[in-house]
Amino acid sequence: MASTSKPAASTTAIKKYYFYVLLCADQTLYGGFTDNLQRRLATHNAGKGAKYTRVRSRRPLQLIYHETFTDKSSALKAEYAFKHQSRAAKLKYLSAHDVKI
């Protein structure tokens, strides 16, 4: 007797990418990109992240905002756009997304 089996359900998770904003201890803002928010924040706070966040006076860093994307390109574009704004424009962007600093 032949056995019939159904194909296994796909367990492939959709990859997520994040654009995030950190508030530094010196009240400056840092925007970045990652595929793992918790790991990246821990790396920044350990002084092993981006050159900007390695400065001791900027730590600890606090995650104040993030956006989720299903493709890397969109997350990188969001990071690029944020980083090329003035501080006033960054604050306006965050305020429009209900982030209070």
UniProtKB/Swiss-Prot annotation:
Matches recorded under SUPFAM superfamilies: GIY-YIG endonuclease (SSF82771)
Gene3D superfamilies the record matches: GIY-YIG endonuclease
Domain GIY-YIG: 15-92
Species: Lactiplantibacillus plantarum (strain ATCC BAA-793 / NCIMB 8826 / WCFS1) (Lactobacillus plantarum)
InterPro entries assigned: GIY-YIG_endonuc, GIY-YIG_endonuc_sf, UPF0213_domain
Signal sequence interval, chain numbering: none
Protein name in the entry: UPF0213 protein lp_2058
Family to which this protein belongs: Belongs to the UPF0213 family.
UniProt superkingdom: Bacteria
